[in-house]
């Protein structure tokens, strides 16, 4: 069973994403801020991180950068209500696996999760 960390400072969004993933049979942990997320990433093995761009203390891009420095093979889906092309470009430069704009289509989200986890398994 794949283990996924959901990071979003919007508690409702975090719960919705977590519930969707749990219904899909995944083991899910949640984090509501970047510092907590980084601690969890260092202490646990996650197959995938679902990471919001805009967090309270530190940006999702900073979390992405630090997480990938710790675990270069980590797979990350970044989500954002801000469809700014420069944010997406920077996330891709840092190594994000996928980037979804909020609100996102649930089928598209679930498919992105499955595709990324399947690629990780096949490597």
Question: Model-found features: residue ranges?
Answer:
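Two-component/phosphorelay signaling modules centered on CheY-like receiver
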Residues: 11-29, 94
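Short amphipathic alpha-helix used as the core "switch/output" element in two-component signaling
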Residues: 39, 61-72
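Alpha4 helix (beta4-alpha4-beta5 surface) of REC/receiver domains from two-component response regulators
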Residues: 62, 83-98
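The feature encodes the CheY-like receiver
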Residues: 14, 56, 84
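Active-site beta3 strand of CheY-like receiver
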Residues: 45-50, 55
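C-terminal output helix
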Residues: 86, 104-113
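Acidic catalytic/metal-coordinating carboxylates
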Residues: 33, 59-62
């Amino acid at each position: 069973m794949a283990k996924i960390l959901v990071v979003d400072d919007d508690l409702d969004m975090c719960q919705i994403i977590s519930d969707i993933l749990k219904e899909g049979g995944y083991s899910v942990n949640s984090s509501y801020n970047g510092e907590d997320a980084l601690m969890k990433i260092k202490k646990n093995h996650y197959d995938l991180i679902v990471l919001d761009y805009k967090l309270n203390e530190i940006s999702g891009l900073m979390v992405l950068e630090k997480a990938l420095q710790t675990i270069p093979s980590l797979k990350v889906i970044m989500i954002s209500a801000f469809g700014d092309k420069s944010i997406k470009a920077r996330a891709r430069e840092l190594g994000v696996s996928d980037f979804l704009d909020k609100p996102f289509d649930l089928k598209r989200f679930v498919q992105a999760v499955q595709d990324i986890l399947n690629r990780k398994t096949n490597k």
